[in-house]
A protein has these predicted regions:
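N-terminal strand-loop-strand
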Residues: 1-40, 89
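Short connector loops at helix/strand junctions that flank enzyme active sites
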Residues: 4, 36, 41, 69, ...
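Non-DNA-binding regulatory cores of transcription-related proteins
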Residues: 117-123
Length: 164
């Protein structure tokens, strides 16, 4: 059986001459007390019959409340620790991280309590320089930063179009 597949967007911008990427911190109790190594790209499962780029844009909107209208540029595919494959796409754009809104998921919490609680899929978003991202990003997604640096000259500078 092939590993599960997901897709996501690495949103980037040039700010005062420095490349920055938008990363998100997942919500919920598992991630509550984690910071270093907990940040990642907005991503989620590819639905049956859905193209990876479409899934990446859909998941970005679900997890940030922001619709991207630019065509995503294929970036890289990475394998996460649990075996899930993540197809990542790069999009140049800008958004205010304080305005994100995320869909929620439900989980039994505390474990074995019989109580179900809802948590946002994304608790927080933050623009980071590549150096900051290398410190805070989930280890399995770090190759995405190198891939972005390598393909940056190929990506059109048409400007981002992140829209709420």
């Amino acid at each position: 059986m092939p590993p599960p597949r997901s897709a996501g967007v690495l949103l980037f911008r040039q700010q005062t001459g420095e490349l920055q990427v938008l990363l998100v911190k997942p919500g919920g109790p598992f991630w509550r007390n984690r910071d270093v190594g907990a940040w990642m790209i907005p991503k989620g499962m590819i639905e049956p019959g859905e193209a990876p780029a479409e899934a990446a844009l859909r998941e970005f909107e679900e997890e940030t409340g922001t619709r991207l209208t630019d065509v995503p540029f294929p970036l890289a595919t990475v394998r996460q620790a649990g075996g899930k494959m993540v197809e990542a796409f790069a999009v140049e754009g800008d958004l205010d991280p304080s305005t994100i809104t995320s869909i929620e998921f439900e989980v039994e919490w505390p474990p074995k309590s019989g109580r179900r609680q809802k948590f946002p899929e994304v608790e927080q978003a933050r623009w980071m320089t590549l150096a900051e991202a290398r410190e805070y990003m989930l280890a399995s997604q770090l190759p995405l930063l190198d891939a972005l640096e390598n393909i940056l000259p190929e990506i059109s500078r048409g400007g981002g179009s992140a829209k709420r």
